[in-house]
């Protein structure tokens, strides 16, 4: 199978005309197309992270599309690391698509071996939502990033980020949420990225306000925003290590410092002095030299962040393994930095609250507006989703198929989904709605450097939980179920359930979504978190062990 270099203009189909034999298959096909439409490098099927792919290659993509268009409503497509390998007669209640992406056994899952397996066309880096067709653009993590910044304000800055400066790096498909999230939280946010294309994309989609022409220009702009106590964002093109050092020399003292660069040297971390294209070429021709140069740059990058910390900034990693890689590069103090999960997100996970999302298969923004209305008439005024929806309407542009992210907890996701299914059935919503989520959720991931870092009981690396999550999703009839690994660093599960207005969809939605959040609550209760134990008791989840017969 040959890589295709001529770009295709892949766009998700809109409207209510079917190309497949049912709305379940059609919606999944549109989600795949939507991934490509929103991808950072669609000509290579790369969606984000400079490497996370939607399919192994274009031949595999075409075979997936062809199968989705012709398969029956009682068949299941099986995909192995972006390659369709089988179509099986199952039953109407079974998932239509099962995917296992990037899973490599234990000691063979390190960076170098994974990179070699990718080069040989045997696996892919799946990301969390790229290879299972659940990506909705940078919006996918904007609320979680916003929530982290707001929580930082509450914990460290008296409840407000007005007049505060956030410094960060990385403006790709994931990191691109940071400047908008910081602006929404009221901060003056400065984001550095070595790739001008990434910053231009964020500018064009409303996630970034302006791109500075130099470090001095960026400093002047960000200081003006902070002095005026206005939320806003500034981008600057440059290597994070170089720019962070320059900003420190010029006496910028940010209040919050974090980072969402792709720090994997094989897949996108750019050494100082090289362009992204030059770095990619060096990885191909001399990977050992690329690794050495990247490690030297990353060490400078981490030391700059530590200097900001020593000057009083709140500094934390945003889940990109910067700390572990910096420690390996000779900066042991980087391991002292906390994670955004342990600082801000874990209390939400204990209540089953996480990044739920819904996508309008019709492509009609009116369908999302209808769901906004359902939310506003269903959830109490003080609920975080009620606070979020007006902000999302104001600030977030749709990318590809109209979609929303909204953090909801146990029982709340199914409550919304059932009301939406009714609206599809009676025509208030014009076509099916796909409900899915990030893999960053309570019960769907084992990631000792991120979601499950420093678990109370030491169960950081126990990966039974995402496996159980995926098996539950299959048992309950999710339309699509995926199991992913990020090399030797994490394992995760994803699922999509489709509201097509039918009674069967209603049954599936209730079962799938309640089990998804329920296993998350149980996971944290099992680890000893009191809030999770209270939530488990409130909802009658779990099994009591001990205490007699």
From Swiss-Prot:
Its cofactor is NAD(+). Changing residue 450 to A: Loss of activity. InterPro entries: Urocanase-like, Urocanase_C, Urocanase_central_sf, Urocanase_CS, Urocanase_N, Urocanase_Rossmann-like, Urocanase_sf. It comes from the Bacteria. It catalyses: S-methyl-(E)-thiourocanate + H2O = S-methyl-thiohydantoin-5-propanoate. Keywords: Lyase, NAD, Nucleotide-binding. The keyword Iron-sulfur does not apply. Its EC number is 4.2.1.-. Binds 1 NAD(+) per subunit. NAD(+) binds at residues 49, 173-175, 193, 198, 239-240, 260, 270, 318. GO terms for molecular function: nucleotide binding; urocanate hydratase activity. GO terms for biological process: L-histidine catabolic process to glutamate and formamide; L-histidine catabolic process to glutamate and formate. Belongs to the urocanase family. S-methyl thiourocanate hydratase subfamily. Hydratase involved in the catabolism of S-methyl ergothioneine. Catalyzes the 1,4-addition of H(2)O to S-methyl thiourocanate, leading to the formation of S-methyl-thiohydantoin-5-propanoate, the second step in S-methyl ergothioneine degradation. Cannot use urocanate or thiourocanate as substrate. This is S-methyl thiourocanate hydratase.
């Amino acid at each position: 199978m040959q890589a295709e270099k001529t770009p295709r203009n892949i766009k998700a189909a809109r409207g209510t005309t079917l190309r497949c034999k049912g709305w379940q298959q059609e919606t999944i096909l549109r989600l795949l197309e939507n991934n490509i439409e929103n991808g950072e490098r669609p000509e290579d099927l790369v969606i984000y992270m400079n490497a996370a792919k939607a399919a192994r290659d274009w031949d595999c993509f075409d075979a997936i599309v062809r199968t989705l268009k012709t398969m029956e409503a009682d068949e299941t497509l099986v995909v192995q690391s972006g390659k369709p390998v089988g179509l099986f007669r199952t039953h109407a209640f079974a998932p239509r698509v099962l995917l296992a992406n990037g899973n490599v056994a234990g000691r063979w899952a390190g960076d170098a071996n994974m990179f070699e397996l990718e080069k040989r066309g045997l696996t892919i880096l799946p990301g969390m939502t790229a290879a299972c067709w659940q990506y909705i653009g940078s919006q996918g993590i904007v609320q979680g990033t916003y929530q982290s910044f707001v929580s930082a304000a509450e914990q460290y800055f008296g409840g407000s980020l007005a007049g505060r400066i956030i410094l960060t790096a990385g403006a790709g498909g994931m990191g691109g949420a940071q400047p908008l999230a910081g602006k929404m939280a009221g901060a003056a946010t400065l984001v550095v990225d070595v790739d001008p294309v990434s910053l231009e994309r964020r500018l064009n989609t409303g996630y970034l306000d302006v791109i500075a022409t130099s470090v001095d220009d960026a400093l002047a702009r960000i200081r003006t925003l902070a002095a005026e106590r206005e939320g806003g964002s500034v981008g600057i093109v440059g290597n994070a290590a170089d720019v962070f050092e320059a900003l420190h020399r010029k006496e910028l003292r940010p209040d919050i410092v974090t980072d969402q660069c792709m720090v994997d040297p094989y897949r996108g971390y750019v050494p100082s002095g090289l362009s992204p294209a030059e770095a990619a070429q060096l990885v191909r021709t001399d990977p050992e030299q690329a690794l050495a140069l990247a490690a030297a740059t990353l060490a400078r990058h981490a030391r700059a962040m530590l200097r900001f910390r020593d000057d009083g900034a709140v500094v934390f990693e945003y889940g990109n393994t910067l700390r572990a890689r910096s420690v390996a590069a000779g900066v042991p103090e980087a391991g002292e930095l906390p994670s955004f999960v342990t600082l801000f997100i874990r209390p939400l996970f204990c209540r089953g609250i996480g990044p739920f999302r819904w996508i309008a298969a019709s492509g009609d923004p009116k369908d999302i507006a209808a769901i906004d209305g359902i939310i506003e008439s269903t959830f109490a005024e003080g609920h975080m989703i009620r606070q979020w929806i007006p902000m999302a309407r104001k600030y977030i542009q749709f990318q590809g198929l109209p979609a929303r992210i909204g953090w909801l907890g146990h029982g709340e996701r199914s409550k919304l989904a059932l009301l939406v299914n009714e609206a599809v059935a009676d025509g208030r919503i014009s076509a099916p709605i796909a409900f899915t989520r990030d893999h960053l959720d309570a019960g769907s991931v084992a990631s000792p450097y991120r979601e499950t870092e420093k678990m109370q009981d030491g169960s950081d690396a126990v990966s039974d939980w995402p496996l159980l999550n995926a098996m539950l999703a299959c048992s309950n009839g999710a339309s699509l179920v995926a199991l992913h690994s990020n090399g030797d660093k994490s394992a995760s599960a994803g699922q999509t359930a489709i509201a097509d207005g039918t009674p069967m969809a209603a049954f599936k939605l209730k079962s799938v979504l309640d089990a998804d959040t329920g296993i998350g609550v149980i996971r944290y209760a099992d680890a000893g978190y009191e809030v999770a134990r209270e939530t488990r008791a409130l909802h009658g989840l779990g099994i009591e062990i001990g205490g007699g017969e």
